Amino acid sequence: MNDNLLLSNISDYNVQFINELKYQVRINPKKHALQTAKEVEGVFIQVLLKSMRSSLLKDNLLDNNQSRLYTDIYDQQLSQEISKKGIGLTDIILKQIEK
């Protein structure tokens, strides 16, 4: 499978999931507010990890499309695991949603 196609499929899945979540929030905002806040925190962590990783020097033999693909997938999984325990943003986001 082409690496770009795989990344595209992963991105499509994320977009579909976010669209489904937006739909659920419109139907019953109070029920899905916590899940939405957790998802926003997860996306923030993923962007943070990607930004930190991009600041590293990339002058090595392992810097290729395949390693970047698997690093992106790893960062996505890592961000999901970190966001399960949370870093404190969920409560702040939840307060903003409920205003």
Curated annotation (Swiss-Prot):
The keyword DNA-binding does not apply. The lineage of its organism: Bacteria, Pseudomonadati, Pseudomonadota, Gammaproteobacteria, Enterobacterales. Belongs to the FlgJ family. Pfam families: Rod-binding. It comes from Buchnera aphidicola subsp. Acyrthosiphon pisum (strain APS) (Acyrthosiphon pisum symbiotic bacterium). This is Putative flagellar protein FlgJ homolog. This protein is shorter than other FlgJ proteins and lacks the muramidase domain. It may be degenerating and may no longer be functional. Keywords: Bacterial flagellum biogenesis. GO terms for biological process: bacterial-type flagellum organization.
